[in-house]
Amino acid sequence: MDVRLRRALLLAASLALLLTLLFAVPAAAQQEPKISQARATEIAKLDPKAVAATEQHPNLTPSASRNSSTGLWEVGFFTGDNEVVQVVVDPNTGKVVESWTGYQVAWRMARGYPGAFGRMINAPYIWLPLCAIFVLGLLDWRRPFRLAHLDLLVVVAGFGLSQYFFNRGNIGVSVPLAYPPLLYLAARALWLGFRRRGGIGLRPSLPITVLAVATVLLVGGRIALNVADSNVIDVGYSGVIGADRIADQKPIYGNFPDDDQSGDTYGPAAYYAYVPFEQAFPWSGTWDDLPAAHAASIFFDLATIAGLFLLGRRLRRGRRGTELGILLAFAWAACPYTAFALESNTNDALVSLTLVVALLCLTSPISRGIAL
């Protein structure tokens, strides 16, 4: 690695460190409602979806409670333990803000709430530039009509179309739209893996120094965004709970709290991976900011990036290996969907890290045994 590249990386690392000093602004305190619980229930009964459900299930039982985060009245209509309809009422105006039926009652993530996954990463002024950096950074301007460039577009545009409808709560459209890009990428991976002749791979037109600096800045930005404005979905929450159970020598399965009853669906390895982070940032017992989940996701992400860099150096010797490692690290750091997983604080990068470690260990029998 030459002197210019080292200086550029040092400057980029300094800028990235400044970005990580961002912090989140605390939410405002919840005010007393002007609309009473009984009044909110009566308003909810007049909602068209509640009326239609009552016609089908005459014995529906309403139950109202305030959401601790938003302060809104959530009026559920139950038949037994099954919530058929949920109507959300503004506690100050009495206006019906939302009403849900079907799977969108139980699964809030399917409602299309802004930022439900990753919060600010979904903002167009962040998401679109990140997509542009990913595509333009890996583009070979000298040969624009390569199939590899179509791969890049499928990642950002193919999945992006599905995500557009998902973010708006239109799951019936979003899910079918996810299949074409998945099938395309699966077919491409099989073709690349089984063809006899090796390809030339991606040959970005940008200098490797630019990609190296961009990688460091992107990593710093991803971490800063995670610290400042990211949320922990049920996946990360489950990991922290499982780690807490293991550390306390309690059963994992069938022993999860009411707000994450189905969180014990993973294998024990997923929970063990969270143990060091839960010990460093002990679980409070509630679904709060969960710093252990943030720390785990950041570690999985950074370890994957480092592993990809080492993998590039393993695949090729000398300077070419370093350049390939930087290219692989840049591709991960610039990909909007790896950032999407990080800002949702999932365990997705743990799977990627496992695959990268497996590839690194393939050339050594001892390493393969340790990895297993």
Question: Model features per residue range: what roles?
Answer:
Residues 1-15:
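Bacterial N-terminal signal peptides that target proteins for export
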Residues 12-24:
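Bacterial N-terminal signal peptides
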Residues 27-29:
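Boundary at the C-terminal end of the N-terminal hydrophobic targeting segment
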Residues 31-67, 118-127:
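Short, non-transmembrane alpha-helical segments in secretory-pathway proteins
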Residues 51-92:
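Exposed beta-strand-loop-beta-strand "reactive/processing" segments of non-cytosolic proteins
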Residues 91-124:
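Short, aromatic-rich amphipathic segments at membrane interfaces
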Residues 113-144:
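Hydrophobic alpha-helical segments
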Residues 138-372:
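Multi-pass membrane glycosyltransferase architecture that uses lipid-linked
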